[in-house]
Amino acid sequence: MNPNQKIITIGSISLGLVVFNVLLHVVSIIVTVLVLGRGGNNGICNETVVREYNETVRIEKITQWHNTSVVEYVPYWNEGTFMNNSEAICDVKGFAPFSKDNGIRIGSRGHVFVIREPFVSCSPTECRTFFLTQGSLLNDRHSNGTVKDRSPFRTLMSVEVGQSPNVYQARFEAVAWSATACHDGKKWMTIGVTGPDSKAVAVVHYGGVPTDVVNSWAGDILRTQESSCTCIQGNCYWVMTDGPANRQAQYRIYKANQGKIVGQTDVSFNGGHIEECSCYPNDGKVECVCRDNWTGTNRPVLVISPDLSYRVGYLCAGLPSDTPRGEDAQFTGSCTSPMGNQGYGVKGFGFRQGTDVWMGRTISRTSRSGFEILRVKNGWTQTSKEQVRKQVVVDNLNWSGYSGSFTLPVELSGKDCLVPCFWVEMIRGKPEEKTIWTSSSSIVMCGVDYEVADWSWHDGAILPFDIDKM
């Protein structure tokens, strides 16, 4: 075959392949059109149908592709609307894990803040973990001495729930060594307490900017909840303490609307002590279970009405839930008086379920280790000892710490009741371990309609860190 014949042959083959390729594309287009025609889509490949609902909480987005429909639920919230939060608490049978940040494990090699007092609060579209930093990172020399509660370096910051308190995702909220935060449906409100012990100031932030202040009125370490405040129909409520930690102090309830204080009430509680209240909305009121750092091993209860009237007493249950505490068998409960005659204490929580109560406590009676939650029949209204459910969250071989409450709003959960949730802080480092620092991580649990098995969701960091060996 001469060169000209070779060129003609190669050209003919190439032309044939091109024609064949064009025919394949034509067939593919015809088949696609026929398939779409059978699907009844009138030839539209992608169609988005938006359906409006009476509740402005979701958009139903239907994407049709060939003969398959994919339904996505897109969260939507009108930011010009206050949350209701006047619903009742859901009745639950157990608590399932919601999130765990593993901050200390990650912080051995990551840029994670040294923190204490983490807590969770939710808006209509998200939950966030708030925490008080020490202005330093784990495994860094500035972490030395961070066992101290109050310093000018402490700040309130937040991340999306489940994230570690890392420098890349954290959002600054306030300068604070004591704090609370909550969302009214429109914006976040945070309260950060800072300054000298005798003249501390609480700065109210709304939407990220300062809007009001509370100055210390007793001159003795003004402090607040270290957990979520509570917003109901646009008004937000929180509790503050000023005065001694080991004898009679002074207590106040505050009410704010869009970051401006619109009311306050002194709580008369002679012989009782209130600190670090864990509050939540229930049936249009604010229910708080607090810490008695003076004498009681039972917990103070404060129920706040929208007009700032209140009822104050103690959790009636015949089982103690503070730490340190005595034996369960030797404890007799009281709805009105401190019982147990044990000083000191730890922040804790409880949830009313009708006349029952879910109450959290450390497993150890003498130290902040282990954590369990008990349901006590009629424990909200009577000195009952009858446990109808118990769930272990952290075993007694591992450290725990503070614990507190919050709820999932109906706008977020899609339920017609408020889902009760709690968090448990797991403190590591000083004073119990040989480190130069003190920090914590947390596990978060939310109520479900099923019983949940015992397990230990403990911190799990291996100590000491490199900085502790220098």
UniProtKB/Swiss-Prot annotation:
The active site is at residues 149, 402. InterPro entries: Glyco_hydro_34 (IPR001860), Sialidase_sf (IPR036278). One of its GO terms (cellular component) is virion membrane. It is found in: Virion membrane; Host apical cell membrane. Disulfide bonds join 90-417, 122-127, 182-229, 231-236, 277-290, 279-288, 316-335, 421-446. Its cofactor is Ca(2+). Residues 32-86 are annotated as: Hypervariable stalk region. Intact N-terminus is essential for virion morphogenesis. Possesses two apical sorting signals, one in the ectodomain, which is likely to be a glycan, and the other in the transmembrane domain. The transmembrane domain also plays a role in lipid raft association. This is Neuraminidase. It comes from Influenza A virus (strain A/Duck/Burjatia/652/1988 H3N8). The lineage of its organism: Viruses, Riboviria, Orthornavirae, Negarnaviricota, Polyploviricotina.
